[in-house]
Amino acid sequence: MASRINTNFTLIPNQKLRRSNRQTSCYSKTLGSGFQPISTFGNFKALPLEIFQIILKYLSVKDISMLSMVSKTVSQHIINYISTSSGSKRLLLQDFHNLELPDRRQDSAILEHYRSLGLLFKRCTLLLPTKERLKYIHKILTEVSCFKFNGCAAPMQCLGLTCYGMFLQTLTAGWDELECHRVYNFLCELTNLCRKIQMAVCSKPGSAQKLELRIRLFCRNVLLDHWTHRSDSAFWLTRILKPWPMVNQARLLYIIFGPISPQDGQVVWQEMIEEPTDEFSLKGLADAIKLLYDASTKEWTADDVISLVDELSVVPREWLLENNARLLMLSGNNICFSFMASKAVNGRTIELARLVVFLALVCEKELYCMDWTVKMMQKVCKVFSTPVERKNFLQNVANAFACVIMEMLQSIMSGDRDEDDRSFLNLFHLVHAQANFHKEVLYLTMNTPLST
């Protein structure tokens, strides 16, 4: 039975547009003999593949990415183009050490390029299983030496790992946790990351400085720094930390987020144990601790994070208590209170009292409100179950102020001149901290607001 042709359209006079008439006639015959679907390669079907690839050279990465979604056939031809030497040379920019342009404009441009490239690979490999996607992408990216763990001779001046991280973040955005687990395992196998981490955390701190630096740069630039959602950052940080015992987790956390030398980027292990440090040196560690504490996952309980903070405070040896206090303050009220409450519950009241003294000292130095320390102490007092325990704790706080002042005074009397100047300034701040602390306690006791 012949097919019926729909004639509900405007007729065009034959003498005009003869080419259109021939196309209509041809189209009618096609319908009459059974409908044939248009090629998924569209109008590009008439072109040799060489011409199609030449056209791709004139398109931006974003445009090629959009084009890859037209059909499976087009996507496959784009994959083939990427695999060619000319395609990979054009798409895999390797200008990672160009410091000529001001205001880091070059950095921004190449990062945006690899963000777009990640989206292109995400779309082109959409129909492949995760394992096959990763194998194909690795095959293409293996040409870029600066993407490798030890690939760049000047890693501190290189944007390679940062671009690689931007690429991976765009590629894996929206993937479920199982797929992201596979990505992490693939990267670990590719770089032998677990073995390298084991060597770093089991060695004497600072004895493998180059390895520590490589681990820090790879973990930060590739796995952690590009995520916009905290839950994603927590997921990847958990993958890095969780395979290891708590003591190694603390060492690894310090390697990744601890203070580094501005000259060579190497981890500074002695900073926390030799002298008071600043907020900048501790901010990375504090942010990582908050990230794990706030993570809505069963993999990190509050007790886990507090234990990690406790372990961190003795890496590589016991920190100055002022640095420990500063880290707790930067980590936020919840973590600070939980840490102090843990000491109260475990009967470590003398340690807790000294910590209160140094919280007050940090408040004084940084011009924070001293009533924060007093209110934190008041909150911790409620953890003690009996009035006798509370009274004993408060007595320990008063004694701790006196003891720390005497320790600083002895340090001044026995030290050299330069040391004297720093110690005297620290003593000056502590005496003022004690005065302001007790002033706040008096206001609280007399129930008199400070503003009156």
Swiss-Prot record:
Q: Does the keyword Plastid apply?
A: no
As annotated in Swiss-Prot or TrEMBL, what is the tissue specificity of this protein?
Widely expressed, with highest levels in kidney, liver and pancreas. Down-regulated in tumors.
Q: Where is the F-box domain?
A: 41-91
Q: Which InterPro entries match?
A: ARM_FBXO47 (IPR056622), F-box-like_dom_sf (IPR036047), F-box_dom (IPR001810), FBXO47 (IPR038946)
Q: What superkingdom heads the lineage?
A: Eukaryota
Known SUPFAM superfamilies for this protein?
F-box domain
UniProt keywords (A-Z) are:
Ubl conjugation pathway
Tell me how this protein assembles: Part of a SCF (SKP1-cullin-F-box) protein ligase complex.
What is the protein's known function?
A: Probably recognizes and binds to some phosphorylated proteins and promotes their ubiquitination and degradation.
Q: What is this protein called?
A: F-box only protein 47
